[in-house]
């Protein structure tokens, strides 16, 4: 059964490379913690500029070019860009160390967005965050952590001494990495679709705050 095989790949990879999953998760959580702290540093105008960079919906909704279906397109493009960046790290020697920074940056943007909504809108901002930000990010963040761990584990295998046994081992690991990479990319795209559907409907309820500014 294909599903059983994929499940075994996932569990085996998680067990064998748990440290990478842990490192990336800690980097992400650190970013989520740092994000809200940045709100105290900037003035309101700067916060709104950062918000537009941090979230595809606000990037479009706070400009005159906003169209509802544009959020879905922008979110998908953003996730594809992240996938390409993460995969590119697999070809760079420093990529092994840059990947945690990618997750850190993603965590900062997420934490900043939620922190902005909560600090400026109170309970309403918290509710909007729960409904309009967290659902899709459960998929997006899981996909980023998984894909990052796959790339990091692939780089570790490449470092091992070459031998006939290693080559066969490497081929098997490469096949698994490709399958897992595709799976995590699909998870990311599911998150992007959710973002395109949920954000205009839920985060749209926050626009009255910006209109009053």
What label would you give each PLM region?
Residues 3-19, 62, 165-175:
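Cytosolic juxtamembrane amphipathic/interface segments immediately preceding
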Residues 146-213:
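Terminal transmembrane helical module of multi-pass membrane proteins
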Residues 102-135, 179-194:
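Hydrophobic alpha-helical transmembrane segments of integral membrane proteins
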Residues 59-89:
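Interfacial helix-start motif at the membrane-water boundary
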Residues 12-46:
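N-terminal signal-anchor transmembrane alpha helix
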Residues 37-40, 44, 90-116:
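Transmembrane alpha-helix/helix-exit interface in multi-pass inner-membrane proteins
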Residues 27-31, 35, 140, 187, ...:
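Alpha-helical transmembrane segments of multipass membrane proteins
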Residues 36-58, 206:
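Interfacial/capping segments of alpha-helical transmembrane domains
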